[in-house]
Amino acid sequence: MLRHRMRWARVALALCAVLLPTLGHAKKKPLPTVRWMAGAPGCSFERGDDGRYRWTMSDKDLDITLLVDSQELTKSRRRFYHVLGVYLTVTYKGQGKFEFPADLRMDFVRHHDVQEAYEDPTELQTRLQNDVDTKIFVTERQIKKNPETAEGKTSLLRRYQKEAAEFIEFLSTQYLEPATLNPGSPEAHGWVFFGTSNKWIGPWKEPEDFLLNVFMKDKVWQFPFSLPPTPGDLILRKPPE
């Protein structure tokens, strides 16, 4: 009888070990969301003469501005790995401190609503540097086989190296980073890129619809936007002075 009870006790313990993680996961609730809406309190939209759109959302402690180039869809296809870029500014207005995690995710609404996390800048730099090294090796091997192509291939390689070096430098200096914000240092800002190599993300559509999710500790700030914002929308860029 005692042996029978011990066997059932072991079974019960095993079931608890299986069920407890599941129950713990089930209790985790999704974060509440606040969404940008045209005309809503704390929400604004601006077309700048610099050729960029700005969506701003505010509450009592934070101002968050999303900036997107009006030609970003075209520019993304000319960028390394065709990454999509946005610029975010977060300004803290409180008197204490605020931990900004710089955790952004993009929903590609018209592409099966695929969600992509932001590209890690260090991983992106490493990937590009590896591709540069590979291109150097391949080019040198091609020139060795066909010396008459040396001038043309060397020129292309140097251009590729220059563009790659500039992009790596950009990633290391201009990317959005986590920050502790306070009255003495109230602002975090920088570029963020999202991959578009997912098999569900095809050629850009007209218009393209996106949903940027900015994750904070207590809630998610959502910026739905389209490129262009309205059909046929065109910004006349102010020429540089």
What is the role of each PLM region?
Residues 22-26:
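Sec/Tat signal peptide C-region and signal peptidase I cleavage site
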Residues 2-12:
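Bacterial N-terminal signal peptides that target proteins for export
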Residues 27-241:
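Conserved functional micro-motifs across diverse proteins
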Residues 1-3, 20-21, 120:
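Helix-centric, low-specificity signal for extended rod-like, repetitive segments
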Residues 12-20:
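Bacterial N-terminal signal peptides
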